[in-house]
């Protein structure tokens, strides 16, 4: 078995061989290397043609019109474009935005940026299982609210939000609805013909495509208007200027084709492996599930092991590539803001591990991972004075610790 075993698919995925092979045809002199904006010769025409094909492939997976797809550098840029673009264009109608405390940093930091520009932002606290309270959402939509931004699947705990119901609430209140679907596109069926979402962000590298390319869905009917962030040649219908990376777009299109073909089998495969993993570790003493198995995505399992530091466990599990949270924030020693928003105390948040599985994960790898987790937890707790006190019956919550 090859080690380390990769269990960090929520951070990024390997590029499918078919995707990489196809991308190579759009890089060199022997292939289609032209600029898709060059309208005066065959090299440009051919590049534009394959970009249009990829745009169609992407739209087919999510039930969109190809003209509603705007290419970006990834989901972070898409989130920025959606939120800042709507806020800038529609600020005369209102300057209030609603989001949640458990959103990705690219949404939260964008909202904080807008607060410094005179906007007000309401950050909803989810229920303990991570789900947004729809009644609370309704109460917080005001006359000057212009945008609600809620992610579909949380990148740390995998909880799935009811974007269908949220979209209806937003439509009834005349408010734009943006969805960060980075962790759901290609894993959970989404049909934008049936769900009235106005803007949706997604990325290629989360579904076995290349890094550095993503998209923003912008609804045409009824038309959604926003101001661009990047100005220049007026590419992407004026919403995102810059020469299109044809090879990356082709790779993204191919990864979306494969996702559409494999989404059902992937879902079954991921659900099976996640259940095996949880069933294999749930009997460890003082283990806590930081999500909801019934309302969670098939590829993410977030667990806390009390009396074990998450960072220490990651170091002990050197044969497993896992995360102590979002890849974008796991370098921080602060406990996960997502888990803290769910009411989880700092000690448990610090002891959390995110396992995220993917298309290439095998049952044999999961079984091996379970054995490694058991072994490492046992060894680390043997070294922990807190664990010894807990096992001796000491109520650690009643102790007043000195902070020097």
UniProtKB/Swiss-Prot annotation:
<feature type="binding site">
    <location>
        <position position="243"/>
    </location>
    <ligand>
        <name>pyridoxal 5'-phosphate</name>
    </ligand>
</feature>
<comment type="similarity">
    <text>Belongs to the class-V pyridoxal-phosphate-dependent aminotransferase family. NifS/IscS subfamily.</text>
</comment>
<feature type="active site" description="Cysteine persulfide intermediate">
    <location>
        <position position="328"/>
    </location>
</feature>
<dbReference type="GO" id="GO:0046872">
    <property type="term" value="F:metal ion binding"/>
</dbReference>
<feature type="binding site">
    <location>
        <position position="183"/>
    </location>
    <ligand>
        <name>pyridoxal 5'-phosphate</name>
    </ligand>
</feature>
<dbReference type="InterPro" id="IPR020578">
    <property type="entry name" value="Aminotrans_V_PyrdxlP_BS"/>
</dbReference>
<dbReference type="GO" id="GO:0030170">
    <property type="term" value="F:pyridoxal phosphate binding"/>
</dbReference>
<keyword id="KW-0963">Cytoplasm</keyword>
<dbReference type="InterPro" id="IPR015422">
    <property type="entry name" value="PyrdxlP-dep_Trfase_small"/>
</dbReference>
<dbReference type="InterPro" id="IPR010240">
    <property type="entry name" value="Cys_deSase_IscS"/>
</dbReference>
<keyword id="KW-0479">Metal-binding</keyword>
<protein>
    <recommendedName>
        <fullName>Cysteine desulfurase IscS</fullName>
        <ecNumber>2.8.1.7</ecNumber>
    </recommendedName>
</protein>
<keyword id="KW-0001">2Fe-2S</keyword>
<keyword id="KW-0808">Transferase</keyword>
<comment type="subunit">
    <text>Homodimer. Forms a heterotetramer with IscU, interacts with other sulfur acceptors.</text>
</comment>
<dbReference type="Pfam" id="PF00266">
    <property type="entry name" value="Aminotran_5"/>
</dbReference>
<feature type="binding site">
    <location>
        <begin position="203"/>
        <end position="205"/>
    </location>
    <ligand>
        <name>pyridoxal 5'-phosphate</name>
    </ligand>
</feature>
<dbReference type="GO" id="GO:0031071">
    <property type="term" value="F:cysteine desulfurase activity"/>
</dbReference>
<dbReference type="GO" id="GO:0051537">
    <property type="term" value="F:2 iron, 2 sulfur cluster binding"/>
</dbReference>
<keyword id="KW-0408">Iron</keyword>
<keyword id="KW-0411">Iron-sulfur</keyword>
<comment type="pathway">
    <text>Cofactor biosynthesis; iron-sulfur cluster biosynthesis.</text>
</comment>
<dbReference type="GO" id="GO:0044571">
    <property type="term" value="P:[2Fe-2S] cluster assembly"/>
</dbReference>
<dbReference type="InterPro" id="IPR016454">
    <property type="entry name" value="Cysteine_dSase"/>
</dbReference>
<feature type="binding site">
    <location>
        <position position="155"/>
    </location>
    <ligand>
        <name>pyridoxal 5'-phosphate</name>
    </ligand>
</feature>
<feature type="binding site">
    <location>
        <begin position="75"/>
        <end position="76"/>
    </location>
    <ligand>
        <name>pyridoxal 5'-phosphate</name>
    </ligand>
</feature>
<feature type="modified residue" description="N6-(pyridoxal phosphate)lysine">
    <location>
        <position position="206"/>
    </location>
</feature>
<keyword id="KW-0663">Pyridoxal phosphate</keyword>
<dbReference type="GO" id="GO:1990221">
    <property type="term" value="C:L-cysteine desulfurase complex"/>
</dbReference>
<dbReference type="InterPro" id="IPR015421">
    <property type="entry name" value="PyrdxlP-dep_Trfase_major"/>
</dbReference>
<comment type="function">
    <text>Master enzyme that delivers sulfur to a number of partners involved in Fe-S cluster assembly, tRNA modification or cofactor biosynthesis. Catalyzes the removal of elemental sulfur atoms from cysteine to produce alanine. Functions as a sulfur delivery protein for Fe-S cluster synthesis onto IscU, an Fe-S scaffold assembly protein, as well as other S acceptor proteins.</text>
</comment>
<feature type="binding site" description="via persulfide group">
    <location>
        <position position="328"/>
    </location>
    <ligand>
        <name>[2Fe-2S] cluster</name>
    </ligand>
</feature>
<dbReference type="InterPro" id="IPR015424">
    <property type="entry name" value="PyrdxlP-dep_Trfase"/>
</dbReference>
<dbReference type="InterPro" id="IPR000192">
    <property type="entry name" value="Aminotrans_V_dom"/>
</dbReference>
């Amino acid at each position: 078995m090859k080690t380390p075993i990769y269990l960090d698919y929520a951070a990024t995925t390997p590029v499918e061989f078919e995707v990489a092979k196809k991308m190579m045809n759009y890089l060199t002199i022997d292939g289609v290397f032209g600029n898709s904006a060059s309208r005066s010769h065959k090299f440009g025409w051919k590049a534009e043609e394959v970009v249009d094909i990829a745009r169609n492939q992407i739209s087919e997976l999510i039930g969109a019109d190809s003209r509603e797809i705007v290419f970006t550098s990834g989901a972070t840029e898409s989130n920025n474009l959606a939120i800042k673009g709507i806020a800038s264009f529609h600020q005369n109608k209102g300057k209030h935005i609603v989001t949640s405390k458990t959103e990705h940093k690219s949404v939260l930091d964008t909202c904080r940026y807008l607060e410094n520009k005179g906007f007000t932002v309401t950050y909803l606290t989810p229920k303990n299982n991570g789900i947004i309270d729809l009644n609370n959402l309704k109460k917080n939509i005001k006359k000057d609210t212009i945008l609600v931004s809620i992610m579909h699947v949380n990148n740390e705990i995998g909880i799935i939000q009811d974007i269908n119901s949220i979209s209806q609430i937003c439509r009834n209140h005349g408010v734009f609805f943006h969805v960060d679907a980075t962790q759901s596109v290609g894993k959970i069926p989404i049909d934008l013909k049936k769900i009235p979402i106005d803007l949706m962000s997604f990325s290629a590298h989360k579904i076995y495509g290349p890094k550095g390319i993503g998209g923003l869905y912008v609804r045409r009917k009824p038309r959604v208007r926003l101001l661009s962030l990047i100005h220049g040649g007026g590419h992407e219908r004026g919403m995102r200027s810059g020469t299109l990376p044809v090879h990356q777009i082709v790779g993204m299109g191919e990864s979306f084709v494969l996702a559409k073909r494999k989404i059902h089998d992937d879902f079954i495969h991921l659900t099976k492996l996640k259940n095996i993993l949880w069933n294999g570790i749930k009997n460890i003493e003082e283990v806590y599930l930081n999500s909801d198995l019934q309302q969670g995505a098939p590829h993410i399992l977030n667990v806390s092991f009390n009396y074990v530091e998450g960072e220490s466990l990651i170091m002990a599990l050197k044969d497993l590539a896992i995360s102590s949270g979002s890849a974008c924030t796991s370098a921080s020693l602060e406990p996960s803001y997502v888990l803290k928003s769910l009411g989880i105390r700092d000690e448990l948040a610090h002891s959390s591990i995110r396992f995220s599985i993917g298309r290439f994960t095998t049952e044999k790898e999961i079984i091996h991972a379970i054995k490694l987790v058991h072994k490492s937890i046992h060894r680390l707790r043997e070294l922990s004075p807190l664990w010894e006190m807990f096992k001796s019956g000491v109520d650690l919550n009643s102790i007043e610790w000195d902070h020097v």
